[in-house]
Amino acid sequence: MARQLRAEQTRTTIITAAADLFDRHGYESTSLSDIVAHARVTKGALYFHFAAKEDLAHAIMELQSQAARRVAGEIDDRGCASLEALIRLTFGLARLSVEGPIARAGLRLATGGVAVRPPLPHPFVELLDLISRRLGGAVKESDIHSDVDVDAVAHSLVCFVVGTRVVGRTREPAGRLPRRTAEMWQVLIRGLVPVPRRPRYMSLAARLEREIVAAV
């Protein structure tokens, strides 16, 4: 049991070190030797868990997917309105990126052309599905104008979430993501939400930003 626990801890250490390097330097610019040095483990320990760098990348994207689904599931369990669930989801994903390198590295790997192994969905496809379902629900609940093109808005929202992180990677720290997410919603709420319902969701976005900043 103790040996198994140490092995799991070593695996986690290696994944975290790899995620940090992939996030900061990219997949192609990071070698297994770099990861070994950053994780402070032996090459034998690394190869015990991962036969190749691609296996590490896949493990990171798998963890990112699990975290995103967990955040979405926890929000769904609250039973809140669809638009509130969508806003909370985007801030939840921003928080994952602020708190650790796994989410940030997973995104960089996806935008860097690293292959996603089935049955794991591509991160952008998964995000599009999470967003589309909640947008559709918000239209039915009259929190979003009925004539909105849900597919177009969902695609634009995915591009915003991904693009903000890609651009911000070289321009500002990950801690800026909650602010950028709040700015996104200030624009979207004005364009999508009927006037009487806007104050509620503007207030929600501002509150979620404050909560993340206070927590980290």
What are these regions (language model features)?
Residues 125-129, 133-141, 171-216:
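C-terminal peripheral helix-coil segments that are non-catalytic and often amphipathic
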Residues 23, 47-51, 63:
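Base-recognition residues in the alpha-helical recognition helix of bacterial helix-turn-helix
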Residues 28, 144-145:
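Conserved hydrophobic residue
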Residues 91-144:
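Short secondary-structure transition hinges
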Residues 44:
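Key DNA-contact positions within bacterial/archaeal DNA-binding proteins
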Residues 59, 66, 70-99, 103, ...:
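Hydrophobic alpha-helical connector segments
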Residues 1-25, 29-41, 54-58, 67:
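Basic, helix-initiating cap at the start of DNA-binding domains
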Residues 92-94, 146-167, 176-191, 206-210:
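Hydrophobic alpha-helical segments that form the core
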